[in-house]
């Protein structure tokens, strides 16, 4: 029989919030008796936007902005019912996007 595994992907613009959320998830899973692999840092997506700042449409004056999306991956191997309940009740910051796959 195959082992049950929960894969959690976290995304955020601020890496400090992301790391603290990952630490909370890992601590909760270990406390309930599950085996944890991670958090594994995934490549950061960098989006660059170039905007013309000249009022008359001159091509020489531009301004660039960038947005970085940091990602982490956590695998929870052989989670019990206590682990799933604890993860459902866990309160994480609003800036973190969570994707869970069973």
Swiss-Prot record:
GO cellular component term, pick one: ribosome
Gene3D superfamilies linked to this entry: Ribosomal protein S10 domain (3.30.70.600)
PROSITE patterns recorded: RIBOSOMAL_S10
Signal peptide: none
Record GO biological process: translation
Matching InterPro entries: Ribosomal_uS10 (IPR001848), Ribosomal_uS10_CS (IPR018268), Ribosomal_uS10_dom (IPR027486), Ribosomal_uS10_dom_sf (IPR036838)
GO molecular function: structural constituent of ribosome; tRNA binding
Functional note: Involved in the binding of tRNA to the ribosomes.
Family designation: Belongs to the universal ribosomal protein uS10 family.
Subunit-structure text: Part of the 30S ribosomal subunit.
Name this polypeptide is given: Small ribosomal subunit protein uS10
Source species of the chain: Symbiobacterium thermophilum (strain DSM 24528 / JCM 14929 / IAM 14863 / T)
């Amino acid at each position: 029989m195959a082992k049950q595994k929960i894969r959690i992907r976290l995304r955020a613009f601020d890496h400090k919030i992301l790391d603290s959320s990952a630490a909370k998830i890992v601590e909760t899973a270990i406390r309930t008796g599950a085996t944890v692999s991670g958090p594994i840092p995934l490549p950061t997506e960098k989006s660059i936007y170039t905007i013309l700042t000249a009022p008359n449409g001159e091509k020489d004056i531009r301004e660039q902005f960038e947005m970085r999306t940091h990602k982490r991956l956590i695998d929870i191997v052989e989670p019990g019912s206590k682990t799933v309940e604890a993860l459902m009740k866990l309160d994480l910051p609003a800036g973190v996007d969570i994707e869970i796959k069973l």
